[in-house]
Amino acid sequence: MSKEDSIEVTGTVLEKFPSGLFSVQLEHERVVLAHLAGRLRRNRIRVLAGDKVTLELSPYDLTKGRITFRHR
């Protein structure tokens, strides 16, 4: 799947799970599970509850995503 196939949305982190997953509420009130992208993990970007983030969702499964950017 190429980058053009993914859906990019923004949301707010609700909670962090011990396994590295995050519960994120999207702008349109949907809650999805997301994990950090490798670039964020490699640069040790901290994501906490309440942070605004940008997600990539697969068009095949809209319940799981990847956090690609943390807004300030």
From Swiss-Prot:
HAMAP family noted in UniProt: IF_1
Quaternary structure and interacting proteins, as annotated: Component of the 30S ribosomal translation pre-initiation complex which assembles on the 30S ribosome in the order IF-2 and IF-3, IF-1 and N-formylmethionyl-tRNA(fMet); mRNA recruitment can occur at any time during PIC assembly.
Keywords: Cytoplasm, Initiation factor, Protein biosynthesis, RNA-binding, rRNA-binding
Keyword Nucleus: no
Entries under CDD domains matching the protein: S1_IF1
Gene Ontology molecular functions: ribosome binding; rRNA binding; translation initiation factor activity
Protein's organism: Solibacter usitatus (strain Ellin6076)
Family per record: Belongs to the IF-1 family.
Function of the protein: One of the essential components for the initiation of protein synthesis. Stabilizes the binding of IF-2 and IF-3 on the 30S subunit to which N-formylmethionyl-tRNA(fMet) subsequently binds. Helps modulate mRNA selection, yielding the 30S pre-initiation complex (PIC). Upon addition of the 50S ribosomal subunit IF-1, IF-2 and IF-3 are released leaving the mature 70S translation initiation complex.
One Pfam family, short name: eIF-1a
Domain S1-like span(s) in chain numbering: 1-72
GO cellular component: cytosol
Protein name: Translation initiation factor IF-1
Subcellular location: Cytoplasm
